[in-house]
């Protein structure tokens, strides 16, 4: 091996070896335990960022570790290639999304290879190819025939100037990002998949996901939002149909003083027809898209419709208000309002002078006061007629029973989860395989006419989707009759909901090859950001159950174990421009002065401007604080970047990018390289004779095997990769100081270095591969992970700490099997101990076996 560690030459050579030998190409092998490791696949944006590097390094570390455990490891990669950014880039660069996407894939693929990730490139695919989305289209038609797909009108963001639908991220402060026109809500027909039919199973099966972070499971439970309540009807004067509402608090029913309905409710539309003021308010509400998260803090507004609803039990008439906090997308679009016992209802009632009637009082008999705020706790009913004195559950059951007996309500289970709207009015997505014939009937495209191919040679005007603008593209036939294609495309979450399964058989002439899929699935380790907790991870779980029910897979869940890696943070700097806005400056263009504690005192950019330090924040283009992985690999080598990524922070916590830390990782690798070089340069070593080791040699070997045990547990079970690396570093410090005079010294060092190199292999595969060869071994990629020798961990001697009146006063080295009497005797005779006990009377001696002798004296 070369004396100097030169990663650039070394890494290229070893990457070529992996390519030539197809090292990471795998097939099913019934005789080997499989391990499927998957990192969330990237969107081909053009360049890898450090968030990608962290995600894929974690995946590669897990994969290589499992490989050395003797498992049949599959680690695939591909491209989540459809999506809005490609359309925006195409408009900006005056090209089509397809060539931009394919060029980016090629560039990013090379970047991934330079980082040494052990992918099975034979399984690579991009979701924007017909070979991939063709099976998605066919599966969608099968779901349609099963009754799991339907079409209904739903609201979208509409720009009246451009006459186009906008994605949520294209709406800025309520206006179109392109022309600044106020955005409206427009109802159009869209396709939905019935995820709600699987709501209970999706909820229940979370209990089986022992390998998932509790936080993600909690987020999904809340998103699914199961609640038990009562569905009840309020008749409306002058209307045939009653208002249906759902409540989880039927015990408060006698305190209802108004009913709130959403602006999109049919009753609101009807009431506003002859009421211009109400019509204007309804329009305002409908064009103000409110996220559910904002409901608690937004200003509550409403308007009386003039309609009166009739209380289902006491017959009292209450006003019906259109209210901006009632959403049509959730529940029935109508709520019963109890201002005395719901804070939102209280604020609204206070604002509009509506009655506040308390009907629940504290169980402990304390005074009830609803003058300043609602009393929202459960309690005992009063002023509720026959239900007075009942506690929550008794009242719930009794009121539900009475409503049911009178045909005005029933107990029901409700879910917050809504069906999955999969239509997007964009171009760069998979075409939805449905057609409409001239009689207005909708039909799925027959399997023999799939895929419906998205034309790639298009011109983007930045306004209308090319397949909507091209009237000829939509023209087709169905059973010989003229028909029009659906010009909406699938939500890109569709492609990412089943890609993990396609990797098992990427060339299959069906969505999956069941035999191969059931060998590899479920994924043993999935790695990705927690931001995907409620969308991608839920849709993938749903899709897996659809695949199971269609007979393709036998497992219930797609991902056994989930690791959500933390974000990568970096220093961010800005100066204020003439208009008062922030101009962000790249950290690489900033010179920093620090105080004695390392805090930034002054920062100046390359133009001589003093800039403000905004702190350590997430790397992003908008803050101009991203660090190009390519530059770091060119400067330090892939192994150093990988090692820093795994060492700088626990995998599930944020990582603060510090180039000084990268330099530290590089120095450590060089130290390992140097010791291996020095050791191998001295020639071959004799066999290690463990029976004739000296005390010091036994102690060093014990450290080696303790480290193997710790690193194996840290990587394999705990996934605390940073502590595994810290343990290897600690061992290296001892090896650097170890004597190398005798033949057995060198034999012991040989065993230790082989263990160190193998343990570093998942993090630093290139350097480890070369050092392994230098140590006289062959092909580290198919080697076996080091195992610790139980006998080496057995200690001949123990160090006992002697404490006198709570202070450390002496240390005793005793035989590992020394008795308590022997330790007491030695402790009381120890010179240091005797010095501190002089003139004192011993009151108590406490012995903690193998660790501590505690003497209390006065």
From Swiss-Prot:
Biological process annotations from GO: leucyl-tRNA aminoacylation
UniProt motif ('HIGH' region) ranges: 42-52
E.C. designation(s): 6.1.1.4
One cellular-component annotation, GO: cytosol
Keyword Cytoplasm: yes
Localization annotation: Cytoplasm
Record flagged with keyword Amino-acid biosynthesis: no
CDD domains noted in UniProt: Anticodon_Ia_Leu_BEm, LeuRS_core
SUPFAM superfamilies listed in its UniProt record: Anticodon-binding domain of a subclass of class I aminoacyl-tRNA synthetases (SSF47323), Nucleotidylyl transferase (SSF52374), ValRS/IleRS/LeuRS editing domain (SSF50677)
Gene3D superfamilies, A to Z: 2.20.28.290, 3.10.20.590, HUPs, Isoleucyl-tRNA Synthetase, Domain 1, Valyl/Leucyl/Isoleucyl-tRNA synthetase, editing domain
Protein keywords: Aminoacyl-tRNA synthetase, ATP-binding, Cytoplasm, Ligase, Nucleotide-binding, Protein biosynthesis
Domain of life: Bacteria
Primary location group: cytoplasm
Motif placement: 'KMSKS' region: 618-622
Entry GO MF terms: aminoacyl-tRNA deacylase activity; ATP binding; leucine-tRNA ligase activity
Reaction catalysis annotation: tRNA(Leu) + L-leucine + ATP = L-leucyl-tRNA(Leu) + AMP + diphosphate
Binding site for ATP: 621
Xref: PANTHER family: LEUCINE--TRNA LIGASE, MITOCHONDRIAL, LEUCYL-TRNA SYNTHETASE
Family: Belongs to the class-I aminoacyl-tRNA synthetase family.
Protein name per its UniProtKB record: Leucine--tRNA ligase
């Amino acid at each position: 091996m070369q004396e100097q560690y030169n990663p650039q030459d070394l890494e290229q050579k070893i990457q070529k070896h992996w390519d030539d030998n197809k090292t990471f190409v795998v097939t099913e092998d019934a005789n080997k335990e499989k391990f499927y490791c998957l990192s969330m696949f990237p969107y081909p944006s053009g360049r890898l960022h450090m968030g990608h590097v962290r995600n894929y390094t974690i995946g590669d570390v897990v994969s290589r570790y499992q490989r050395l455990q003797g498992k049949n490891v599959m680690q695939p990669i591909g491209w989540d290639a459809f999506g809005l950014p490609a359309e925006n880039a195409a408009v900006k660069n005056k090209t089509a999304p397809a060539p931009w996407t394919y060029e980016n894939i090629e560039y990013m693929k090379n970047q991934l290879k330079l980082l040494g990730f052990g992918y099975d490139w034979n399984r690579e695919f991009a979701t924007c190819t017909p070979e991939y989305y063709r099976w998605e289209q066919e599966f969608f038609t099968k779901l349609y025939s099963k009754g799991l797909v339907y079409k209904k009108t739903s609201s979208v963001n509409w720009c009246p100037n451009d006459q186009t639908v906008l994605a949520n991220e294209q709406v800025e402060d309520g206006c179109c990002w392109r022309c600044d026109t106020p955005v409206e809500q427009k109802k159009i027909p869209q396709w939905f998949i019935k995820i709600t039919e699987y709501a209970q199973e999706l909820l229940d099966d979370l209990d089986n996901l022992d390998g998932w972070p509790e936080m993600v499971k909690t987020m999904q439970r809340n998103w699914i939002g199961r609640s038990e309540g009562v569905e009840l009807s309020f008749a409306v004067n002058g209307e045939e149909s009653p208002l249906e509402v759902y409540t989880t608090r039927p015990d408060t029913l006698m305190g209802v003083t108004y009913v709130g309905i959403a602006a999109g409710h049919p009753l609101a539309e009807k009431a506003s027809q002859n009421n211009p003021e109400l019509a204007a308010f309804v329009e305002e509400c409908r064009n103000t898209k409110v996220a559910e998260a904002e409901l608690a803090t937004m200003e509550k507004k409403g308007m009386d419709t003039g309609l009166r609803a009739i209380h289902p039990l006491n017959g009292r008439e209450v006003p019906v208000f259109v209210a901006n906090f009632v959403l049509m997308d959730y529940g029935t679009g109508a709520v019963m309002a109890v201002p005395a016992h719901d804070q939102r209802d209280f604020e609204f009632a206070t604002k509009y002078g509506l009655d506040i009637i308390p009907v629940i009082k504290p169980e402990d008999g304390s005074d009830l006061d609803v003058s300043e705020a609602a009393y929202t706790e459960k309690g005992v009913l009063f002023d509720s007629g026959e239900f007075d004195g009942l506690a929550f559950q008794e009242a719930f059951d009794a009121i539900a029973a009475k409503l049911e007996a009178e045909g005005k309500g029933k107990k029901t289970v409700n879910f917050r989860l809504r069906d999955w709207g999969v239509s997007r009015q964009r171009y760069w997505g998979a075409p939805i395989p449905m057609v409409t014939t001239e009689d207005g009937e909708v039909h799925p495209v027959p399997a023999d006419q799939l895929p419906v191919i998205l034309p790639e040679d298009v011109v983007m005007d930045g306004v209308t989707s090319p397949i909507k603008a091209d009237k000829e593209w939509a023209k087709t036939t169905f059973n010989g009759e003229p028909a029009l294609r659906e010009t909406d495309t699938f939500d890109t979450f569709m492609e990412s909901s089943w890609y993990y399964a396609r990797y098992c058989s990427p060339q299959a002439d069906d969505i999956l090859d069941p035999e191969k899929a059931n060998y590899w699935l479920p994924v043993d380790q999935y790695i990705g950001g927690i931001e995907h907790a409620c969308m991608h991870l839920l849709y993938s779980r749903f899709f897996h159950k659809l695949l199971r029910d269609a007979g393709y897979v036998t497992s219930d869940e797609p991902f056994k174990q989930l690791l959500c890696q933390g974000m990568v943070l970096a220093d961010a700097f800005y100066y204020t421009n003439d208009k008062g806005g922030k101009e962000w400056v790249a950290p690489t263009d900033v010179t920093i002065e620090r105080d004695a504690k390392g805090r930034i005192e002054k920062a100046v950019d390359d133009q001589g401007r003093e800039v403000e330090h905004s702190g350590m924040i997430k790397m992003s283009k908008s803050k101009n604080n991203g660090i190009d992985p390519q530059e770091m690999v060119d400067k330090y080598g892939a192994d150093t970047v990988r090692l820093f990524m795994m060492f700088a922070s626990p995998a599930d916590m944020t990582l603060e990018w510090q180039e000084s830390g990268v330099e530290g990782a590089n120095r450590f690798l060089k130290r390992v390289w140097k010791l291996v070089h020095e050791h191998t340069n001295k020639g071959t070593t004799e066999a290690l004779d463990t029976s004739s080791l000296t005390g010091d040699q036994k102690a060093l070997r014990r450290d080696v095997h303790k480290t193997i045990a710790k690193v194996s547990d840290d990587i394999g079970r705990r996934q605390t990769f940073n502590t595994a690396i810290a343990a290897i570093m600690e061992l290296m410090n001892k090896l650097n100081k170890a004597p190398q005079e005798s033949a057995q010294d060198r034999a012991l060092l040989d065993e230790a270095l082989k263990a160190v190199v193998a343990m570093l292999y998942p993090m630093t595969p290139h350097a480890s591969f070369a050092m392994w060869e230098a140590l006289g071994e062959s092909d580290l990629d198919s080697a076996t992970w080091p195992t610790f020798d139980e006998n080496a961990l057995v200690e001949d001697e123990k160090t006992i700490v002697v404490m006198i009146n709570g202070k450390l006063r002496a240390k005793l080295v005793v035989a590992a099997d020394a008795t308590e009497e022997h330790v007491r005797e030695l402790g009381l005779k120890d010179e240091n101990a005797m010095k501190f006990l002089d003139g004192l009377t011993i009151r108590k001696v406490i012995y903690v076996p193998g660790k501590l002798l505690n003497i209390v004296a006065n």
